[in-house]
UniProtKB/Swiss-Prot annotation:
It comes from Saccharophagus degradans (strain 2-40 / ATCC 43961 / DSM 17024). The keyword Protease does not apply. GO terms for molecular function: structural constituent of ribosome. Residues 1-28 have a biased composition (Basic residues). One of its GO terms (cellular component) is cytosolic large ribosomal subunit. Pfam families: Ribosomal_L35p (PF01632). GO terms for biological process: translation. This is Large ribosomal subunit protein bL35. PROSITE patterns: RIBOSOMAL_L35 (PS00936).
Amino acid sequence: MSKAKTHSGAAKRFKKTASGYKHKHAFKSHILTKMTTKRKRQLRGTSLLNAADKPAVDRMLRAN
């Protein structure tokens, strides 16, 4: 059986913490002129991964 590999795309996007996985918000890279200042401010920083997505990310990062 081959070695388990970490999903390199997921490894770049998610950081494991004691309370779950930390990730950046989507929709914050380009074409931001249409977006209100309030919305851009809300998308700043990081947030924790939703519990429903945790098993999938666990599988992708299983080799860590």
